[in-house]
Amino acid sequence: MGRPKQLLSLGPKTVIRHCLDSIIGAGLKDIVVVLGGDDGAIAGAIDGLPVKTAENRDPGSEMAESVRLGLRQIDAASTAVLVCLSDHPLVSPETIRTIVAAYGGHPGGIIIPLYKGRRGHPTLFPRTVIEEVVSGRNLREVITGHSGDVLSIEVNDEGVVLDLDTPEEYERVKGRFI
């Protein structure tokens, strides 16, 4: 797409600002953004926001490595972690609050949002499984290994399944801001 997708514009804000505004707007604390690649520009785009950053010095590595780096920065007192992807900019604060509330009713569970039956993001992981990810398992392996602890919740938010992996997807999402 010519530049990091986190820096693409959606209306007056960048993709990364849309993501973080939803997370912050949902009332979450201890937010960690993992930077890699062209991060001077991304760091500038999030300057002033109440977030911590971690640097992935090998931005070509698997996504799991970025997740591990972020998880290592989370406060030890946190009971759960919401893993948000920076290419899902349309997830609403209300959806994030719904996911967190579902965890309150299913403590220890992995909470995955669905839109019309299709799994989406972000996913909430309990502290009890975070160490598995930090020690080397990827998120998919953790979800599979704890399938009995997964709670899938239907949400009325297409943003959980809309990502920006291709220029066509970006144009489709961008069209919502015109």
Regions found by a protein language model. Name each.
Residues 1-35, 43, 99:
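N-terminal glycine-rich phosphate-binding loop and ensuing alpha1 helix
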Residues 27, 47-50, 146:
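Short, structured coil segments at secondary-structure junctions
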Residues 29-31, 80, 149:
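Residues at the starts of beta-strands that form the adenosine-phosphate
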Residues 37-38, 58, 62, 94, ...:
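Short beta->alpha linker loops
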Residues 40-46:
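Acidic helix N-cap motif at the loop->helix transition within catalytic regions
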Residues 48-61:
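Conserved donor nucleotide-binding strand/loop of the catalytic core
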Residues 60-132:
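Conserved beta-loop-beta/alpha segment of the NTase-like Rossmann-fold superfamily
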Residues 131, 135-178:
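Conserved alpha/beta core of the MobA/IspD/sugar-nucleotide pyrophosphorylase nucleotidyltransferase superfamily
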